Amino acid sequence: LGINCAVTDLERVDDGKNEQLYYEGVRQGVELASGLQHALEYAVKHLPIPKVMTYQLADGVTTVSFVRPVRHLTALLGTEIVPVELFGLKSGRLTRGHRFHTSEPIAIENADSYVEQMKAAFVMPCYDERRAVIEAELKRRAAALDAEAIMPEDLLEEVTALTEWPVIYESQFESEFLAVPQECLILTMQLNQKYFALEDRSGKLMNRFLLVSQLIAKDGGKAISEGNARVVRARLADAKFF
C-alpha cells in the first residue's frame, strides 16, 4: 500500500453510504533537512514536464535535466537556512528578482518575508495571485474598450506560468483580416501568439486584442504593441491565404 502496512492493519468505517478503509498509526519523525531533501527530489522527479533540457553543472562534467537551468536554491525555516542540495546547488538565502527590472542579488531575511521581498524585486511568486491579477486586468482593459476578452482556461494557465510580473497591453490588426472566419483568427491568436481576442457586446470579433507581457515599458507599451501587431499581421496573412 506504500505505507508499509498490511491489509490486516486497516480499519473499516461506514458513513452510511460507503464503506471505507483507513490506516491509523504513529511514525517516527525525521529531521527537517532530510525530509525536505526527499520531498524536493520526489517533487522534481514527478513534475509533469513534457520537454526538458540537459545542461552541464559548474564542474563542467556533471549533467542534469530540467525545464530550464536552475541558478539558485533558497530554503529557509524562519531565519535559518535548511541545508538541502538540488541540481548541483546548495541551499542558501540568496536569489534574484526580475531579470530586466532588478540587477542585484536578494538576500531573503526570513521565510515569512520571501513573498514581499520578491514583489519588491518585481516577481510575484504566487501562481494564484498572478492569475487573479491577469484575469482582473484583462477584464478591466476589455471593459475600457466596451468589449469582452475571450479567456480560455488553458490559455490563462499558460500565460500565468510564463510570467513573473504580468502587465497587460493592447494591440490591433488591420480590419481587413476580419473577413477570415472568426474561429480561424481566434485560434491563430491563442495558439500561436498567446493573445486574448476581443469581442464587442454583440459577440462579433474585434480587430483588437490583449497580450500579457512581463515588462513595465517606459513608453507605456507602445513598442510592445507595435511589435506584436507586426507579428500577428504575418500570422493572420497566412491564415487568410490558406
What are these regions, as identified by a protein language model?
Residues 1-195, 199-204:
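Long, basic N-terminal domains or extensions that often function
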Residues 197-242:
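Function-dense linear segments that define catalytic or interfacial modules
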